[in-house]
Amino acid sequence: MKRTFQPSNLKRKRSHGFRARMATKNGRKVIANRRAKGRARLTA
């Protein structure tokens, strides 16, 4: 059986990257929440 996690940096950046987050209102909310919490890393 194939494992479910098949890592790809391109797919990772496209779905969870900074620019992907900033592209939508909800994504910007995610960034804001993570900044407010004081996360060292905001995005993948």
Curated annotation (Swiss-Prot):
Q: Kindly list the biological process annotations in GO that this record carries.
A: translation
Which key words tag this protein in UniProt?
Answer: Ribonucleoprotein, Ribosomal protein
Question: What PROSITE patterns does its record include?
Answer: RIBOSOMAL_L34
Check the record and name the Pfam families matching this protein: Ribosomal_L34
Q: Name one GO cellular component term.
A: ribosome
On whether Ribonucleoprotein is a keyword of this UniProt record, the answer is: yes
Regarding protein family, the annotation reads: Belongs to the bacterial ribosomal protein bL34 family.
Q: What is this protein called?
A: Large ribosomal subunit protein bL34
Q: Its encoding gene is what?
A: rpmH
